[in-house]
Structure formats: structure tokens, C-alpha cells
């Protein structure tokens, strides 16, 4: 008789344990889904910020390029234009990485000047900030 009670109690304990494990798995999966959704939202916001920043940098680079384009250039300004072109290619490669890699393999010799900096971040941000600073300095000098 005691054997039946032992089997019944062990069966109840096993089923309660199975239910608790199942509930834990459900709560973990719900938590994972919520974390994944919040990560997607964060990535979406980050993507929008980066997209806006890329657009602003492209606009600034195009404006500087058009400023230097319509007048005679010195060797230093010519080097600046080459860097601007490299920056524009890098910004485009962020949007279309497959096409950019194809372009780079086709025109490798033309891109030697663009490869002055080793990392893309340095190639994009360093020259842009320098060019924007020098352009603003030149404008302030002309105004003042």
C-alpha cells in the first residue's frame, strides 16, 4: 500500500516539476522576444541616426567639392579633392558594400590616394572634419 502512495506522490512531484520547467521556458522565451524587440528598436534608431549623419556628411562633402571645383586649385586643394572623392566612395560603400568592393577591385590603381588611411572610420571622419574645419576657417577669414 505504501508503494502506491510513493508512486502517486512521485508522479505529482514530477508533473509539478515539469509544469514549472515549462513555465520557466515560456517566461524565458517571452523575455528573449522582448529583448530582441528592444534591440531591433535600438538598431532602428541607431540606423536612422547613422543615415542622417551620412546624409549630412555627404552634403557637406558635395558642397566642399563644388566650392573647390569652380576655381583654380593648388596642389594641396587637388589632394583635398582626391580625399573628398575617396570619402564619397566610402560613404557610398556603406550603403552598397557589394558594388563598392567590385568598384575597388576594378579601379585599384586609381584608389591609391584614397587608401592613405588604414581604417574606414579614419578615412571618413578625419578628412571630413579637417575639410569642414578648414572650409569654415576660410569662410570666417573671408568674412572677417
From Swiss-Prot:
GO terms for biological process: defense response to bacterium; defense response to fungus; killing of cells of another organism. It is found in: Secreted. Residues 19-43, 73-122 form a propeptide. Its main location: secreted. Expressed by the skin glands. Keywords: Amidation, Amphibian defense peptide, Antibiotic, Antimicrobial, Cleavage on pair of basic residues, Cytolysis, Fungicide, Hemolysis, Secreted, Signal. InterPro entries: Bombinin (IPR007962). Residues 1-18 form the signal peptide. It comes from the Eukaryota. The modification Isoleucine amide is found at residue 143. GO terms for cellular component: extracellular region. Disulfide bonds: none annotated. Maximin-3 shows antibacterial activity against both Gram-positive and Gram-negative bacteria. It also shows antimicrobial activity against the fungus C.albicans, but not against A.flavus nor P.uticale. It has little hemolytic activity. It possess a significant cytotoxicity against tumor cell lines. It possess a significant anti-HIV activity. It shows high spermicidal activity. Maximin-H11 shows antimicrobial activity against bacteria and against the fungus C.albicans. Shows strong hemolytic activity. Belongs to the bombinin family. This is Maximins 3/H11 type 2.
Amino acid at each position: 500500500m505504501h508503494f502506491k502512495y510513493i508512486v502517486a506522490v512521485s508522479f505529482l512531484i514530477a508533473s509539478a516539476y515539469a509544469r514549472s520547467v515549462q513555465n520557466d521556458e515560456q517566461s524565458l522565451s517571452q523575455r528573449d522576444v522582448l529583448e530582441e524587440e528592444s534591440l531591433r528598436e535600438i538598431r532602428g534608431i541607431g540606423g536612422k541616426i547613422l543615415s542622417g549623419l551620412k546624409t549630412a556628411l555627404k552634403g557637406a562633402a558635395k558642397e566642399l567639392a563644388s566650392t573647390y571645383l569652380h576655381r583654380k586649385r593648388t596642389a594641396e586643394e587637388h589632394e583635398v579633392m582626391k580625399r573628398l572623392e575617396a570619402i564619397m566612395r566610402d560613404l557610398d560603400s556603406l550603403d552598397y558594400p557589394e558594388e563598392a568592393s567590385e568598384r575597388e577591385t576594378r579601379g585599384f590603381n586609381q584608389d591609391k590616394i584614397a587608401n592613405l588611411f588604414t581604417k574606414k572610420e579614419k578615412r571618413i571622419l578625419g578628412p571630413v572634419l579637417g575639410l569642414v574645419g578648414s572650409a569654415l576657417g576660410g569662410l570666417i577669414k573671408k568674412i572677417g
